[in-house]
């Protein structure tokens, strides 16, 4: 469950290391975002010569949460931290060309096939 002011790790090579959620998109008073949801983020920590810089405001899709996601068979997939993949504000395609760490199959339902194909492992 990601809400405003939540700090997340970045699971791609866009150049950002830590980001902060500033808005959960999809509804006027929506409070929480889970895996596969799009959020508005600001870059809090970035590496030199990256594609993004500190202070940039972009969109991102949540790919891993500590809360996890429940499957229809009753199993729950949880992760050690919250992570997102940074998206282009207009096309909503990933800015990075590599994805680090596993992602869940739930992204397939949300039409993020590019992230699924770049990920090293899909749970």
UniProtKB/Swiss-Prot annotation:
UniProt GO BP: translation
SUPFAM superfamilies on file: Ribosomal protein L14 (SSF50193)
Pfam entry (one): Ribosomal_L14
Keywords attached to this entry: Ribonucleoprotein, Ribosomal protein, RNA-binding, rRNA-binding
Gene3D superfamilies in the cross-refs: Ribosomal protein L14
Molecular function GO labels: large ribosomal subunit rRNA binding; structural constituent of ribosome
GO CC terms of this entry: cytosolic large ribosomal subunit
Top-rank taxon, per record: Bacteria
Signal peptide: none
Keyword Coiled coil applies: no
Protein family per UniProt: Belongs to the universal ribosomal protein uL14 family.
HAMAP family: Ribosomal_uL14 (MF_01367)
Subunit structure: Part of the 50S ribosomal subunit. Forms a cluster with proteins L3 and L19. In the 70S ribosome, L14 and L19 interact and together make contacts with the 16S rRNA in bridges B5 and B8.
Role this protein plays: Binds to 23S rRNA. Forms part of two intersubunit bridges in the 70S ribosome.
Protein name: Large ribosomal subunit protein uL14
Organism taxonomic ancestry: Bacteria, Pseudomonadati, Pseudomonadota, Gammaproteobacteria, Enterobacterales
